[in-house]
Amino acid sequence: MTERMILKVDHTGIDKPLLWTAILLALAGLVMVSSASLQIAETRLGDPFYYAMRHGIYLALGLGVGAFVYYAVPLALLERLRFVMLPVALVALVMVFIPGLGRTVNGSTRWIALPGLTIQASEIVKLCFVLYLAGYVAQRKAALETEWKAFLLPLGLLGVLMLLLLLEPDFGAVVVLGITAMGMLFLSGVPTLRFLLIGLIAVALGGLVAFAEPYRVARLMTFTDPWADQFGSGYQLTQSLIAFGRGHWFGVGLGNSVQKLFYLPEAHTDFVYAVMSEELGLLGNVALIGGFILLGWRVFRIGHRLEARGLLYHAYLVYGCAFVFCSQAFINLGVNMGLLPTKGLTLPFISYGGSSLLISAVMVGLILRAGAEADHLKARGRAAR
């Protein structure tokens, strides 16, 4: 690669609070996955550290991939390749429906099974769509503020991706993708009235989707009163709430959770936050939420600074990553606490899952790269004067 392809950046200007927040969240995730998965790993696989070791490997790979993205992937190259991102996302979604490639877990076909590797298609879709939409907004920002066509085009493409996600089904990914897209378009300056109209349509369609499948209706009914069927459809949520109740202020101690002993399903994946709350109590609970608030604030701050400097692609790429992190964390935490219906979403950096951890690491690398490139360009401008 030439120097033009790899833009030199000032690595001393890296956003250290963001970097360390992401690292600490990932390390906390490793600890909690290790604790929450001991019994289930020993029972299912005969090795209590199976999931912990795999998660550690994913974390190491994530650090390596994130570092590579930060040091060696110029955002100008990604901006030029933005039109490739949608075909990549579509291919990933179609692959889950190919016999022999798609893997079904708990009734959902969301994974691509490759030799020695399983990839969750929706994680690829989130990243690819953010990369595409950031480039679209950077090129069409003025048109987005005035033209319906410019606003509806990305929504139409989004609808295709959502349809394929619903066929898996993966309603949680649909919600995250929708929030991310609408958030990025809103920040681009699309008039509020258009959002209200689209919002009404989205709510109506969301209602139809929610009531089209019996299992979604059951989830909604369970969400309103999980104790009405605590040994049936409300079992997972009631066990999660029991975990929160047992935690009190300071928890029962790391490794001492009772709910992870086959009472709480998905204790090391979607509901690891409940186990964390049981073992570390309200103190650990608040610390984790504070970590995500700090992460979101730093990322949005970087995006705002980039937009103020006129680096629109950089800014909206960062905004998109921020919406993915914040919406997914908010939904997962809300589901664990019984504030939202069950969605089947992992908690970024914390839950067990290689695809989620790797894509999160890539996004952090892109965010840090965007900030570093902006600092380099600013310093080069001062030197030129």
From Swiss-Prot:
Class of enzymatic activity (EC top level): transferase
Reaction(s) the record says it catalyses: [GlcNAc-(1->4)-Mur2Ac(oyl-L-Ala-gamma-D-Glu-L-Lys-D-Ala-D-Ala)](n)-di-trans,octa-cis-undecaprenyl diphosphate + beta-D-GlcNAc-(1->4)-Mur2Ac(oyl-L-Ala-gamma-D-Glu-L-Lys-D-Ala-D-Ala)-di-trans,octa-cis-undecaprenyl diphosphate = [GlcNAc-(1->4)-Mur2Ac(oyl-L-Ala-gamma-D-Glu-L-Lys-D-Ala-D-Ala)](n+1)-di-trans,octa-cis-undecaprenyl diphosphate + di-trans,octa-cis-undecaprenyl diphosphate + H(+)
GO MF terms held by the record: lipid-linked peptidoglycan transporter activity; peptidoglycan glycosyltransferase activity
Main location, first listed in the record: membrane
Keyword set includes Chaperone: no
Pathway info: Cell wall biogenesis; peptidoglycan biosynthesis
Transmembrane segment boundaries: 18-38, 57-77, 81-101, 111-131, 157-177, 195-215, 280-300, 311-331, 347-367
GO aspect biological process, one term: FtsZ-dependent cytokinesis
Cellular-component GO terms for this entry: cell division site; plasma membrane
Phosphoprotein listed as a keyword: no
Membrane topology: Multi-pass membrane protein
Localization per Swiss-Prot or TrEMBL: Cell inner membrane
Alphabetized UniProt keyword annotations: Cell cycle, Cell division, Cell inner membrane, Cell membrane, Cell shape, Cell wall biogenesis/degradation, Glycosyltransferase, Membrane, Peptidoglycan synthesis, Transferase, Transmembrane, Transmembrane helix
Purpose of the protein: Peptidoglycan polymerase that is essential for cell division.
NCBIfam families recorded: ftsW (TIGR02614)
Homology family: Belongs to the SEDS family. FtsW subfamily.
Name the UniProt record assigns to this protein: Probable peptidoglycan glycosyltransferase FtsW
Species name: Alcanivorax borkumensis (strain ATCC 700651 / DSM 11573 / NCIMB 13689 / SK2)
Taxonomic path: Bacteria, Pseudomonadati, Pseudomonadota, Gammaproteobacteria, Oceanospirillales
